[in-house]
């Protein structure tokens, strides 16, 4: 015969009951998982980013052939290759991908700027393929503004002779000039060739002094290593007859294709260390003096033009 015996609710029994209820609640709640979301776990490619959103490099040395852009990541354990897209013009080539070595937190993306023209401002962008990065935290695109510039180095002092603007009845009017060279290029600047206003007056008159005067004449040696060009024209500081009648020293072919053959008269003499210029002297809208008045540059270390001419 079964006899019911009432148990005493000691503190030990109460603790057991409470523990059982807690375990039941945990088991019940663990079954209700329909609203849980996947937890984000970083992997090596999701950390890749450009280090700058905008890159402005407008003084790239003209002789430089590549330009480096840095990418970074926070998880360097594994090697990874990241795809890159570019909107840069065809004169600049960018690789289609960049690789991080295992253990490295940075990678260098080198773009080829060897065909980038000097003086022109180039704009474009580079972007990381979205499948390789977490766009919520990474700099996915970097915008670039690039330009090349010559690095000018002084060669020292030379001499400048101008048969039209500086020579007078009593003097050759030869002027001391600083000569600069573009580093890595056969390109030169003759600095302040018409700074001597008194000599211009002696050659012409005070009434012929104008307001436009070239701070330098920039010229370059052509690929035939004989002829030189200066592209457009320079101002000699003189006017012919009142305002707006500047006397300009044109590259003949720039003034007119009719005079293109006269370009060949302008030559460098490396043996004598001189350059002969035959500009077409012209006043816009009026006419000119043709190419019969040459100019001569004696390089630093070249001859004294008083004796040479």
Question: What label would you give each PLM region?
Answer:
Residues 2-7, 14, 32-166:
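Acidic/polar, low-complexity intrinsically disordered N-terminal segments immediately downstream
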Residues 27-30:
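C-terminal motif of bacterial Sec signal peptides marking the signal peptidase cleavage site
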Residues 14-20:
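Sec-dependent signal peptide recognition
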Residues 149-309:
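Ser/Thr/Gly/Pro-rich, low-complexity flexible regions
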Residues 21-25:
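Alpha-helical transmembrane segments
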